[in-house]
Amino acid sequence: MPAIRPFRALRFVPEAVGDLATVVAPPYDVLSADDRARLRASNPANVVRLDAPTEEPGDADDDRYRRAARTLAAWRSDGTLHKDPRNSIYVHEQTYRVPGTDVERTQRGFFGRLRLEPLERGSGVLPHERTLAAPKEDRYRLLRATGVNTSPVIGLYDDPSGRAGTIL
């Protein structure tokens, strides 16, 4: 069974950013260039500036990652982001409309810290898809520059007894 632990999250400060809906974004790998531009325009503190930094004309190899790191430092300094004082498990709920329908769904889960172990150790965490070299390199370079995970790894869990659902 995977060991899930609490952690101290960096969170947007609502008083600094306004409506939290304007600072969130879909996963970086589903965003088009137009999506990124729209999100950047929606709020100067939209997370896309950290999670999917764009290349600017004249950029050297790692400039966009360094720019994300500078943005992160500025947001921490000016109060846009705040690091929680205590380790926590963060409950998450997101309601959305299924594209092209009037159907509304709610996704519930949590954010926690999980140690990644090699598969052969039997950690209980199974691979979910084939991963490609370029996106892995991109995420590694962003992590190396910023020192933070800017987007979660999404996992599914089996809960036949409903225990996790009751807790959430």
Annotate the PLM regions.
Residues M1-L168:
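A cross-family signal for N-terminal binding/gating loops and helix N-caps
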